From Swiss-Prot:
Gene name, Swiss-Prot/TrEMBL: rnhB
Primary location: cytoplasm
PANTHER family documented for this protein: RIBONUCLEASE H2 SUBUNIT A, RIBONUCLEASE HII
Domain RNase H type-2 as annotated: residue spans: 34-223
Protein name (Swiss-Prot/TrEMBL): Ribonuclease HII
A GO molecular function held by the record: manganese ion binding
Organism of derivation: Rhizobium johnstonii (strain DSM 114642 / LMG 32736 / 3841) (Rhizobium leguminosarum bv. viciae)
Amino acid sequence: MKPRTPPDSPLLFDTAPLVPDFRLELKARKAGHWPVAGADEAGRGPLAGPVVAAAVILDPKRIPEGLNDSKQLSAQRREELFVQILATATVSIASSSSTRIDETDIRKASLDAMRRAICSLAIPASYVLTDGLDVPPGLDCPGQAVVKGDARSVSIAAASIVAKVTRDRMMARAHSVFPDYGFAAHVGYGTAQHRAGIERHGPCSLHRMSFRPLRKTENGPETDELLSE
């Protein structure tokens, strides 16, 4: 006899993509918290460049259509939504440089950037939804960490888009200073092109020397601080 799935339970192997909505924000509002900010970061995995965090408070009456996890969107669609988010929402952006990442670690640097983004919002948040497992310490308001939050909350999705587009633009500028690594193409991730550039030229000042692939390489070209924190 075939086992039955309980009527109110999702299929165990349901792989349908999540679609972000405003339910978590409305739940916080019902509990007395308003406004609600979503926060996310971009750039935890690359071998070079900063980690960038964004915090976004959406206007419930002007939510851009098509918000989703930035990784599920084309570069062109991210750029389009980026413009719409900046025009309709309260947005704050912060970053932690590769130097800060090396001095602490990527988790601490990411949470610090997220904390600074949240605390710099022009309209103080009463509650924060963050993507992942952690709420940054040191906030002036309570918050909730949401696993796969950028696919569940439109506020977090908006923050993921702002962080991703901002970081991609920063790495495009870095490419003009360090053209030997191909930053404009891979934005610092460990692609074959990037690793070949490191092998030929050594790392530059934007590389994260604490990351395992770079720990044994010699210092290459340096420059003044290119990307402000």
